[in-house]
């Protein structure tokens, strides 16, 4: 059961409804619900969902290829992209036909393993943003990495995002929704 986070879900839905290229950065501390928000948002949408792993570029590219193939099942079995640029080019072109959400969760893991990923994303966004209906979501828990390498003025992706969401822990009243049968004092204790 998903409770709360109406503000975040509304913001994402408003961007989705625009039907043009959108790029949202979602970040915040670990375990605050970033992935849960994304999962709730995409549950009724065409989505390519890729979660980066703390590994090397080859492993992440294989996993990204698998995510694309899970979405586009008519690709030959065992198909793999030879680079992130090829994979992203394919996704951007797919999204010329219809609205697709591309989620790259744990983005810092992928970007650290593939040093050129940010500039490749920059190139693909600049090349395809006017023709593509892609809704790109980059999500990460390493707040310093997201702020310094995605949101900062000197970062390759600076100026390309159309929104950012810094996910905070639940406020008391929102957290209370998780414990509807608790007495007020017990809710306060549960909240911490």
PLM feature spans:
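Phosphate-binding site recognition
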Residues: 1-192
């Amino acid at each position: 059961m998903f409770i709360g986070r109406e503000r975040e879900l509304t913001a994402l839905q408003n961007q989705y409804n625009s039907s043009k290229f959108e790029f949202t950065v979602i970040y915040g501390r670990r375990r605050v619900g970033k992935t849960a928000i994304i999962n709730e948002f995409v549950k009724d949408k065409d989505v390519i969902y890729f979660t980066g792993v703390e590994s090397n570029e080859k492993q992440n590219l294989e996993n990204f290829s698998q995510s694309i193939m899970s979405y586009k099942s008519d690709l030959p079995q065992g198909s793999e992209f030879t680079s992130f640029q090829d994979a992203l080019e394919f996704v951007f072109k797919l999204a010329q036909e219809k609205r697709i959400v591309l989620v790259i969760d744990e983005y810092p893991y992928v970007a650290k393993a593939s040093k050129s990923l940010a500039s490749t994303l920059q190139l693909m966004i600049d090349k395809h943003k006017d023709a593509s209906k892609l809704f790109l979501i980059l999500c990460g828990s390493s707040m310093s990495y997201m702020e310094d390498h995605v949101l900062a003025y000197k970062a390759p992706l600076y100026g390309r995002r159309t929104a950012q969401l810094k996910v905070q822990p639940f406020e008391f009243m929102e957290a209370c929704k998780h414990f509807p049968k608790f007495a007020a004092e017990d809710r306060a204790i549960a909240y911490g």
